[in-house]
Amino acid sequence: MVATDRDQLTELSTVWRGAGHVAGSAATIALVADVPGNERRLAYDLGQATVNLMLAAADLGIGSSHANVEDQEKARRILDLPAGKHCAYLISLGYPADRPLEPLRRPNRRAFEDVVHRGRW
């Protein structure tokens, strides 16, 4: 689900000590899931969704940051989630204020061939 209301974003920023960036975002996506049955599978699936969403946002020049949700009861109240659902992660989105988000043109790193081994070490 997507939150864009400034008051709601400010409230959501308090569900975890590292979620302060949510308050200043243009929008925040709440990844909502069924109350976990298989937590490892859920964490994997939501992790994949999170990284793909963040990569797609970067490709569009949109900055993003993720946050955990520590206070589930508070998040459920803020988002008005039905029984059996919980908010797993928050992903804040927005355009950088100081500069356009651009990929590194000349990354300062070793060549791919120097760090990847093929078939054996």
Name each model-derived stretch.
Residues V32, N68, L93:
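Conserved residues at the C-terminal ends of beta-strands
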Residues L90-W121:
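C-terminal helix-cap and adjacent tail motif
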Residues I29, G37-I78:
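Small-aliphatic-rich amphipathic alpha-helix that forms the alpha element of a beta-alpha
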Residues G37-R40, A88-Y89, L101:
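A short, structure-level motif marking secondary-structure boundaries and short turns
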Residues L79-I91:
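Short, electropositive alpha-helical surface patch
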Residues R77-P82, P103-R106:
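Short proline/glycine-enriched turn/loop segments at secondary-structure junctions
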Residues M1-L46:
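Glycine/small-residue-rich phosphate/adenosyl-binding loop
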Residues H21, D59, P82-A83:
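Arginine/glycine-rich "motif VI" loop of SF2 helicases in the C-terminal RecA-like domain
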